[in-house]
Amino acid sequence: MVIDPELGIDIVNLGLVYKVNVDDEGVCTVDMTLTSMGCPMGPQIIDQVKTVLAEIPEIQDTEVNIVWSPPWTKDMMSRYAKIALGVS
């Protein structure tokens, strides 16, 4: 699980992960976004994603693509994340 260090919620519940694919060679491609283009924790979050996925034996390599479309909004958060952060 990768926790956003600024918000304290995992990136899946925050709605930051858009797509995950693993090909036949075990290469995992993750399309994800950040809460803002200037997010100072972006490189740290990407490193954490790669570290967590490297623990899965079937994953041989990981590519993390930061995408800005669609733009992230609080509406993408799970109910859990909204409650935890006090967002309605």
From Swiss-Prot:
Gene3D superfamilies to which the protein is assigned, alphabetical: Fe-S cluster assembly (FSCA)
One Pfam family of this chain: FeS_assembly_P
SUPFAM superfamilies from the UniProt entry: Fe-S cluster assembly (FSCA) domain-like
Annotated knockout phenotype: Cells lacking this gene have decreased activities of the Fe-S cluster-dependent enzymes AcnA, LeuCD and IlvD, meaning a defect in the assembly of Fe-S proteins. They are capable of growth in liquid chemically defined medium containing the 20 canonical amino acids (AA) and glucose as a carbon source, but display growth defects in defined medium lacking leucine and isoleucine.
Domain of life, per lineage: Bacteria
InterPro entries associated with the record: Fe-S_Maturation_MIP18, FSCA_dom_sf, MIP18-like
Upregulation: Transcription of sufT decreases when aerobically cultured cells are shifted to an anaerobic (fermentative) environment, and increases upon reaeration. Up-regulated upon culture in serine dropout medium relative to liquid 20 AA medium.
Function: Involved in the maturation of iron-sulfur (Fe-S) proteins. May function as a Fe-S cluster carrier. Is required for S.aureus growth under conditions that impose a high demand for lipoic acid, likely via a role in the maturation of the lipoate synthase LipA. Is non-essential for growth in conditions that impose a low demand for lipoic acid or Fe-S clusters, such as fermentative growth. Also seems to be involved in the maturation of AcnA, LeuCD and IlvD proteins, that utilize Fe-S cluster cofactors, and its role increases under conditions of high-demand for Fe-S clusters (respiratory growth).
Family classification: Belongs to the MIP18 family.
The protein, known as: Fe-S protein maturation auxiliary factor SufT
Organism whose genome encodes this protein: Staphylococcus aureus (strain USA300)
